[in-house]
Amino acid sequence: MAIILGVDPGSRITGYGVINCVGRQQVYVGSGCIRTSSDELPLRLKQIFDGLSEIIRQYQPDEFAIERVFMAKNADSALKLGQARGAAIVAATAANLPVAEYSATQIKSAVVGTGRAQKSQVQHMIQQLLKLPSAPQADAADALGVAVCHYHTNQSLAAMGGRANSRTYGRYK
């Protein structure tokens, strides 16, 4: 049994999703969004750190997975996203959680079956996979997708006799 916290980072909205993995089953535990209220980036980063630290205390996850930074057309947006990821990763490492990173393509492939899936397709598949009464909000669905991707990656590696490691899957120690 493992509880996985998945995070879809953003400087304004950071989605989180928690699943409990029992054998080959993934059970929905909780999800939501941390919406930052300040216009000043340092205060938004603190809100992300504090919010995820509280979520970690509440759900007591065993593992933490986060979406990797993608290349953005706007360099300023990419930098802010990277800083939001940093705040999230520090919250995880402060709680001694192993951190794994996955690209958007890996996440979409694990959830939908194609790396070019639309957000609405991810929402629909997360609803189906986790047997939810309705589709979660987009950022929360993406975060649940990160957790599902991490579960499937570890299941595949376990079948081959291993687990995600720091070189291959971007874990921090």
UniProtKB/Swiss-Prot annotation:
InterPro entries of this UniProt entry? RNaseH-like_sf (IPR012337), RNaseH_sf (IPR036397), X-over_junc_endoDNase_Mg_BS (IPR020563), X-over_junc_endoDNase_RuvC (IPR002176)
Q: So what does this thing catalyse?
A: Endonucleolytic cleavage at a junction such as a reciprocal single-stranded crossover between two homologous DNA duplexes (Holliday junction)
**Cofactor detail note:** Binds 2 Mg(2+) ion per subunit.
Active site, renumbered: D8, E67, D139
Pfam families annotated for this entry?
RuvC
GO cellular component annotations of the record = cytoplasm; Holliday junction resolvase complex
UniProt-recorded Gene Ontology molecular function terms? crossover junction DNA endonuclease activity; DNA binding; magnesium ion binding
Superkingdom is Bacteria
Residues binding Mg(2+) 1: D8, D139
Q: What is its EC number?
A: 3.1.21.10
Instruction: Give the subcellular location.
Output: Cytoplasm
**Gene Ontology process terms (BP):** DNA recombination; DNA repair
Cofactors demanded by this protein: Mg(2+)
Q: Which top EC class applies here?
A: hydrolase
Ordered alphabetically, the record's keywords are: Cytoplasm, DNA damage, DNA recombination, DNA repair, DNA-binding, Endonuclease, Hydrolase, Magnesium, Metal-binding, Nuclease
Q: Which residues bind Mg(2+) 2?
A: E67
The record's section on HAMAP family has: RuvC
Q: Which family does it belong to?
A: Belongs to the RuvC family.
The record describes the protein's role as: The RuvA-RuvB-RuvC complex processes Holliday junction (HJ) DNA during genetic recombination and DNA repair. Endonuclease that resolves HJ intermediates. Cleaves cruciform DNA by making single-stranded nicks across the HJ at symmetrical positions within the homologous arms, yielding a 5'-phosphate and a 3'-hydroxyl group; requires a central core of homology in the junction. The consensus cleavage sequence is 5'-(A/T)TT(C/G)-3'. Cleavage occurs on the 3'-side of the TT dinucleotide at the point of strand exchange.
State how it assembles: Homodimer which binds Holliday junction (HJ) DNA. The HJ becomes 2-fold symmetrical on binding to RuvC with unstacked arms; it has a different conformation from HJ DNA in complex with RuvA. In the full resolvosome a probable DNA-RuvA(4)-RuvB(12)-RuvC(2) complex forms which resolves the HJ.
Identify this protein by name. Crossover junction endodeoxyribonuclease RuvC
The scientific name of the source species is Shewanella piezotolerans (strain WP3 / JCM 13877)
